[in-house]
A protein has these predicted regions:
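Ligand-binding pocket segment of bilobal, Venus flytrap-like solute-binding proteins
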Residues: 36, 40-129
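Residues at alpha-helix termini
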Residues: 58-59, 102, 138, 184, ...
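A generic short alpha-helical patch detector that favors 3-5-residue windows
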Residues: 43-47, 139-142, 199
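Short aromatic/basic micro-patch
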Residues: 13, 89, 129, 151, ...
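An extracytoplasmic/periplasmic, membrane-proximal ligand-sensing/linker region
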Residues: 63, 158-219
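Hinge/capping helix and adjacent helix->loop/strand transition within the periplasmic-binding protein
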Residues: 1-75, 79, 135, 147-180
């Protein structure tokens, strides 16, 4: 019935001293060394889907890297910093902190279509370095649009759904709601009921196709 927020950006990080510093260089390296890059993610979960879409966009072959289990952000940061895995994702603030101590290499960020270096800086409250540029800003045609939806039981009357949606749209103008989303580095936008349904259908179709291509879909 509505969209709570549009999700937020994730930093894509590599081990310190990695032979690639941005997405284009990562793409070239993977193509030249198929099967050698190790990506830490939640196998069968959201972050594997995220990286599958990224690697597919970079190389045309989502299976040209090795995906290994590494779920928590703490584990990802620790293992990337130690060089145990080559690539992972993490929050922008954590990437900033580890990068400042030269523990990781920041390749860029992946987030919703609305994400830019400028508005990400506004979200996290710091001036982000150019190394945090989004996939789109680096010329890579992929985004990670993961809306947080508000759902209602099946057969809920449209007038009730519309009323809930209107309340959510008004919330996007409330300062405490804005501040809360800023603290989580997530984007908000007022999306009407019809556009919300279309957004969910489009996102579902994309994820379904991606998961099916990975052989992870269970009927």
């Amino acid at each position: 019935v509505g969209i709570m927020n549009q999700g937020g950006p994730q930093a894509i990080i590599a081990k310190p001293g990695a032979p690639y510093k941005n997405f284009a260089e990562l793409a070239d390296y993977i193509k030249a060394n198929p099967g050698q890059v190790v990506i830490g993610c939640s196998l069968g979960g959201t972050t594997q889907v995220l990286f599958t879409s990224l690697v597919e966009a970079l190389t045309g072959d989502a299976n040209s890297v090795n995906y290994v289990q590494c779920s928590s952000e703490a584990d990802k940061l620790t293992n990337v910093a130690a060089g145990s895995i080559d690539i992972a994702n993490c929050s922008i603030p954590n990437a900033e902190s580890y990068d400042a101590d030269n523990k990781i290499t920041v390749l860029g960020s992946l987030g919703p279509k609305v994400a830019t270096l400028e508005n990400m800086s506004e979200l996290v409250g710091t001036e982000l370095d150019e190394k945090f540029a989004t996939t789109q800003e680096q010329g890579i045609d992929v985004t990670w649009d993961s809306n947080y939806y508000v759902l209602a039981p099946k057969d809920t009357p449209d007038e009730i759904c519309e009323a809930i949606n209107e309340a959510l749209c008004k919330a996007s103008e409330v300062q405490s709601f804005i501040d809360g989303n800023n603290s989580m580095a997530t984007y908000i936008a007022a999306v009407n009921y019809e556009d919300t349904k279309k957004a969910l259908d489009d996102e579902w179709a994309f994820r379904d196709g991606l998961v099916s291509s990975m052989g992870l879909k269970v009927r």
